[in-house]
């Protein structure tokens, strides 16, 4: 049983999946969202859930530094509510403060070009969101 991690943005969705034991997160893809057909986003995620036998989906919840939820966080919560109609999984919202910034710093320190960073940053953020969740589950 695997866990899927999502970094939901307005233009793309970074997607990561756990190994079967739930120890490590691997980047799966960066999905380009369709402006005209939001349903395609949910159907694509539903197909990944089936393909990878996912039981839990972790969605990054952008919070302000004071812990409050702003417009981006509200969009993520709305996305999660809609996704529940497409998948039979547990959906968990996970604090993602600074994950995109941390992912970008990691890629810069690895000397990844700006063009390549742009194509993988959301996937890396999804990996960081999912790995944070998996690490916390191991402590329980």
Curated annotation (Swiss-Prot):
Pfam families per the UniProt record, alphabetical: RuvX
EC numbers on record: 3.1.-.-
Role played: Could be a nuclease involved in processing of the 5'-end of pre-16S rRNA.
GO biological process, one term: rRNA 5'-end processing
Signal peptide: none
Subcellular locations according to the entry: Cytoplasm
Protein name: Putative pre-16S rRNA nuclease
Single annotated GO MF: nuclease activity
Family stated for the protein in its record: Belongs to the YqgF nuclease family.
Main subcellular location: cytoplasm
Keywords: Cytoplasm, Hydrolase, Nuclease, Ribosome biogenesis
CDD domains, per the entry: YqgF
InterPro entries from the UniProt entry: RNaseH-like_sf, YqgF, YqgF/RNaseH-like_dom, YqgF/RNaseH-like_dom_sf
PANTHER family, per the entry: POLYNUCLEOTIDYL TRANSFERASE, RIBONUCLEASE H-LIKE SUPERFAMILY PROTEIN
Domain of life: Bacteria
Gene3D superfamilies found in the cross-reference section: YqgF/RNase H-like domain
């Amino acid at each position: 049983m695997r866990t899927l991690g999502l970094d939901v943005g307005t233009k793309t969705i970074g997607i990561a999946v756990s190994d079967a034991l739930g120890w490590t997160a691997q980047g799966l893809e960066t999905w380009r969202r369709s402006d005209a057909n939001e349903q395609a986003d949910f159907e694509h995620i539903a197909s990944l859930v089936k393909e990878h036998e996912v039981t839990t989906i972790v969605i990054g919840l952008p919070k302000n530094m004071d812990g409050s939820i702003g417009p981006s966080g509200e969009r993520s919560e709305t996305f999660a509510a809609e996704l529940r109609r497409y998948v039979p999984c547990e959906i968990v919202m996970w604090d993602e403060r600074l994950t995109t910034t941390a992912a970008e710093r990691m890629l810069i320190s690895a000397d990844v070009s700006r063009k390549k960073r742009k194509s993988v940053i959301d996937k890396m953020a999804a990996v960081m969101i999912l790995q944070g969740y998996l690490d916390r589950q191991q402590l329980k």
